UniProtKB/Swiss-Prot annotation:
Protein source organism: Synechocystis sp. (strain ATCC 27184 / PCC 6803 / Kazusa)
Residues that coordinate or bind phosphoenolpyruvate: 35-36
Main location: cytoplasm
Keyword presence, Iron-sulfur: no
Entry annotated with the keyword Iron-sulfur: no
Pathway(s): Cell wall biogenesis; peptidoglycan biosynthesis
Protein's cellular compartments: Cytoplasm
Gene it is expressed from: murA
Residues where 2-(S-cysteinyl)pyruvic acid O-phosphothioketal is found: 129
Lineage of source species: Bacteria, Bacillati, Cyanobacteriota, Cyanophyceae, Synechococcales
Protein name stated in the entry: UDP-N-acetylglucosamine 1-carboxyvinyltransferase
Catalysed reactions listed for this entry: phosphoenolpyruvate + UDP-N-acetyl-alpha-D-glucosamine = UDP-N-acetyl-3-O-(1-carboxyvinyl)-alpha-D-glucosamine + phosphate
Active-site residues (renumbered): 129
Length: 438
């Protein structure tokens, strides 16, 4: 008898996080170095031809990618745990391979240092999270104001200093929007420019201040960082430095939400409480108390949860990078809440995944209207971007039953061993390989 073989599905695997919800948390979380600060500072090491030694560097996929990008343009790197020694003495003009740059928006940060130090560069247009267009026009206009010739050809930004001058020229630059990336690009380029550069309507984020502190540690003359006007007086050369990265305020806020949603008392160390001011204020509105036990330590004290309204704004307003995590918390907070996203378009994709878990959320434009429910239900969910992935983990901690979070490449870009840190607090979650049927 002729037997016909039955086709079998090809099995591949994907890495997921499996969460058993409703576990109480307790203990202390060690907060890693700030990803967004580290990426800009790593690019800033190009400004100096001597060694730069960085510490408190987080172990993240984005940091790995930036190391690869720097190495591809001739930078020598030696990494040991959270320490990184960078030697940019032989850096080239670029461009870095597009397959690397396309995965990391922060790769574009190298344009300012390369142009200012070498007089010309080629940098591919960047990639990263799919949360809006986030164009680089403000970066480009700032460099042009300082005397750069910039044009885009075949997806590559070509920048050079006009005429016979080997240095950019200081300029007064007004940013139409207080863009963090544009502020960082112009600030770094201005450190080696001739004369004074003034950035008006500059971004005020702590990561800007950290970058300015790093540049000052190399001999740059910068004042006003942390305000809307930054003034940079260019110098001819920068020198080597040892510099620690600040703690990650977004990671800290994420763990505060994890404590609040599980009604658990947890401590965070090290942190800079001032960097968490808006998150702490909103947590107190929602119900939990945040005690500042030391200059670098905070403690989440659980309380009943109630709804509140949140609108994302540039710093010192409520950060867009904390919006998704707080939405997960508000989904199980009594009463009504409205979360309005004003910084990025297309950054409410996590709503559909929270709805799969039983959240009562309705979208209208850039606003999410939330009616709190008593509990969420575990479900398979898909991460859509970095902070959305953290929000789904937080939701899974509070959900009844099992939650499977897929799309971990987003999570690994911005959180160092989040499951290990949560397990240490008592959460029941593990990273597993799960078959995918094609």
């Amino acid at each position: 008898m002729l037997q016909v073989a039955t086709p079998t599905a090809t099995e591949e695997t994907q890495t997921v996080i499996e969460i058993e919800g409703r576990a109480s948390l307790k203990g202390e979380v060690r907060i890693s170095g700030a990803k967004n600060s580290a990426l800009a500072i790593m690019a800033g090491t190009i400004l100096c031809s001597d060694d730069c030694r960085l510490s408190n560097l987080p172990a993240l996929a984005d940091i790995d990618k930036m190391c690869q990008i720097l190495a591809a343009i001739g930078v020598n790197l030696e990494r040991d745990g959270d320490r990184l020694v960078v030697d940019s003495s032989n850096v080239g003009h670029g461009p870095a391979p597009y397959e690397l740059v396309s995965q990391l928006r922060a790769s574009f940060f190298v344009i300012g240092p390369l142009l200012s130090r070498l007089g010309m560069t080629k940098v591919p247009l960047p990639g990263g999270c799919a949360i809006g267009t986030r164009p680089v026009d403000l970066h480009v206009r700032g460099l042009q104001a300082m005397g750069a010739d910039v044009h885009i050809e075949h997806g590559v930004v070509n920048a050079s200093i006009k005429g016979h001058s080997r240095r950019l020229t200081g300029a007064k630059i007004y940013l139409d929007y207080p863009s963090v990336g544009a502020t960082e690009t112009i600030l770094m380029a201005a450190t080696l420019a001739e004369g004074e550069t003034v950035i008006d309507n500059a971004a005020r984020e702590p990561e800007i201040v950290d970058l300015a502190n790093f540049c000052r540690s190399m001999g740059a003359q910068i004042r006003g960082d942390g305000s809307s006007r930054i003034i940079i007086n260019g110098v001819e050369k920068l020198h080597s430095t040892d510099f620690p990265i600040i703690p990650d305020r977004i990671e800290a806020a994420t763990f505060l939400c994890a404590g609040a949603i599980t009604h658990s008392e947890i401590s965070l160390f090290p942190v800079v409480p001032d960097h968490l001011a808006s998150a702490i204020a909103k947590l107190r509105e929602i119900g939990p108390e945040v005690a500042i036990d030391a200059p670098d330590r905070v403690r989440l004290i659980p309380r009943d949860l109630r709804g509140t309204d949140i609108e994302t704004l540039p710093y010192p307003g409520f950060p867009t990078d904390m919006q998704a995590q707080f939405m997960a918390l508000l989904a199980v907070s009594e009463g009504n809440s409205v979360v309005t996203e004003t910084v990025f378009e297309n950054r409410l994709q996590h709503v559909a995944e929270l709805q799969r878990m039983g959240a009562n959320i309705k979208l209208k434009g850039n606003a999410a209207f939330i009616q709190g429910v008593p509990f969420l239900s575990g479900a398979p969910v898909m991460s859509t971007d970095l902070r959305a992935s953290a929000a789904l983990v937080i939701a899974g901690l509070a959900a009844e039953g099992k939650t499977i979070v897929q799309g971990l490449r987003h999570l690994d870009r911005g959180y160092e061993d989040i499951e290990g840190k949560l397990r240490k607090l008592g959460a029941k979650l593990t990273r597993i390989e799960q078959p995918v049927t094609l």
